Swiss-Prot record:
Residues 1-16 have a biased composition (Gly residues). Pfam families: OCC1. Residues 1-62 are annotated as: Disordered. InterPro entries: OCC1. It comes from the Eukaryota. Belongs to the OCC1 family. This is Overexpressed in colon carcinoma 1 protein homolog. It comes from Gallus gallus.
Length: 62
């Protein structure tokens, strides 16, 4: 039990932080959503988004 997160105060702090984090994510611009984090690309390029929507339209073929 040496992690220190098992206390009631720690749990309350994490809940408040999670709420603040959600509000901050909503205000993030589209450019920030597609930012490169440590060499890993986050988000879909516009070409991939167009390709996925095109496949979705062609899928129901009965």
């Amino acid at each position: 039990m040496g992690c220190g997160n098992s206390t009631a105060g720690g749990a309350g702090g994490r809940g408040a932080t999670g709420t603040t984090k959600d509000a901050a994510e909503e205000s993030v611009s589209d450019d920030d959503k597609r930012r490169n984090y440590g060499g890993v690309y986050v988000g879909l390029p516009s070409d991939a988004a167009a390709m996925v929507s095109g496949q979705t339209k062609a899928a129901p073929k009965d």
